[in-house]
């Protein structure tokens, strides 16, 4: 049952469909291309849980930032533009930072941070300066333990808002005022241990919709919340995933111009894809194989064929898996695996610019090794 705190409606979720398993096909195993290489590994704070990229100091080069859950810090690494980074600068933050969302929250054209701090039950704001430093903003108390945070314009006022997943089966909305402050929006009680949140316009009505992975033992499902365009959401619909979904994101996996869904499953070593219908609903999910202990992933075109591929970090096998898409919603198998430092926990896209050339790559946050690893692409470079 969904309970909307502070409002009047209640509703039951609908569990849709079943899972098909892509690995049962008699198709011959693929030979995946070897397109990435480990370029460098850099130390950061203790036990990083997420990593993000932006140009924080306005020098035209990509920089990195991590949340470090065990020493209550952020690590900021300024890029040199060639794949190398300077030694990390430590920023202290509230207890147990776990996730962050980058956006311009105060309208000054610079990148700011919203940090989900699970140990202090807070969303903490940091405002970027042109030299790459950050000023501290307000902290917003939530109950309890924010696990994931994302940002987007939920109410059409062209000011970024926030959505946070809380450990106690709640989703909290904060509506941005455009000056770095936020007004509390609706809070929803639903699901079982939400682990990840993501925003996209799934029914093409111009309003952002919400996907939430529910990773608790009572629910292996992803919940789709259709946005009303005023910061609120309609009652959710659940789609069954693999066991213990930990992360959710979007891409177009079958090249039909409609947004599809990617869910990383922490148990049974799989990921699930759902093909979108364009109206906010999805077809039944299809499971595909990953390596041991997948925890986070993203989609991108990694081989230049204009088809969406998937990159996954696996905490048990200590590697990065690249799974190449076929353009019909299925994927080649086996994946191409790359060894990573101990405990890869999060992955983000990386774009390095050197002069007029842009080189794509990936960066992983390695939780057990307290480091980040930079992977660069062997061939895909473009003129900017």
Task: Label each PLM-derived region with a short phrase.
Residues 70-72, 119-121, 168-169, 216-219, ...:
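Short glycine/acidic-enriched loop and turn motifs that connect beta-strands
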Residues 24-46, 78-95, 127-144, 175-192, ...:
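Blade-edge motifs of beta-propeller repeat domains
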Residues 345-384:
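Blade-level signature of beta-propeller repeat domains, shared across WD40, Kelch, NHL, RCC1
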Residues 10-20:
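Bacterial N-terminal signal peptides
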Residues 60-62, 109-111, 158-160, 206-208, ...:
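Glycine-aliphatic tripeptides that mark coil-to-beta-strand junctions in extracellular
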Residues 49-58, 78, 98-105, 147-156, ...:
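Beta-propeller blade termini
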Residues 64-67, 113-116, 162-165, 210-214, ...:
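Hydrophobic beta-strand segments that make up the repeating blades of beta-propeller
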């Amino acid at each position: 049952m969904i309970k909307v705190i502070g409002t009047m409606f209640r509703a039951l979720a609908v569990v849709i469909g079943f899972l098909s398993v892509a690995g049962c096909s008699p198709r011959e195993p693929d030979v995946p291309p070897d397109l990435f290489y480990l370029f460098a590994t850099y130390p950061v704070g203790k036990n990083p849980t997420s990593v993000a990229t932006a140009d924080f100091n306005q020098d035209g080069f990509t920089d990195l930032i991590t949340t470090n859950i065990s020493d209550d810090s952020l690590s900021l690494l300024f890029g040199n533009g060639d794949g190398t980074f300077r030694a990390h600068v430590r920023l202290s933050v509230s207890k147990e930072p776990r996730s962050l969302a980058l956006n311009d929250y105060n309208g000054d054209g610079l990148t700011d941070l919203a940090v989900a701090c699970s140990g202090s039950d807070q969303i903490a704001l940091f405002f970027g300066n042109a030299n790459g430093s950050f000023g501290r903003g307000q902290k917003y108390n939530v109950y309890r333990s924010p696990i994931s945070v994302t940002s987007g314009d939920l109410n059409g006022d062209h000011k970024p808002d926030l959505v946070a997943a809380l450990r106690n089966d709640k989703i909290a909305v904060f509506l941005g005022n455009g000056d770095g402050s936020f007004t509390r929006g609706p809070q929803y009680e639903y699901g079982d241990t939400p682990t990840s949140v993501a925003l996209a316009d799934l029914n093409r009505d111009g309003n952002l919709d919400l996907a939430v992975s529910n990773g608790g033992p009572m629910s292996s499902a992803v919940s789709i919340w259709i946005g009303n365009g005023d910061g609120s959401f309609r009652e959710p619909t659940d789609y069954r995933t693999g066991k213990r979904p930990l992360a959710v994101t979007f891409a177009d996996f079958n090249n039909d111009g409609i947004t599809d869904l990617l869910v990383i499953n922490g148990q049974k070593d799989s990921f699930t894809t759902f093909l979108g219908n364009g109206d906010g609903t999805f077809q039944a999910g299809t499971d595909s194989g990953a390596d041991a202990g997948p925890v986070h992933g993203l989609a991108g075109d990694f081989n230049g064929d204009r088809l969406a591929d998937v990159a996954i970090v696996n905490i048990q096998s200590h590697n990065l898996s690249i799974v190449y898409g076929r353009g019909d919603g299925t994927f080649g198998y086996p994946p191409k695996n790359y060894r990573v430092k101990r405990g890869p926990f999060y992955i983000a896209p990386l774009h390095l610019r050197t002069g007029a050339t842009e080189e794509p790559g990936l960066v992983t946050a390695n939780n057990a090794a307290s480091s980040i690893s930079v992977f660069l692409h062997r061939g895909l470079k473009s003129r900017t």
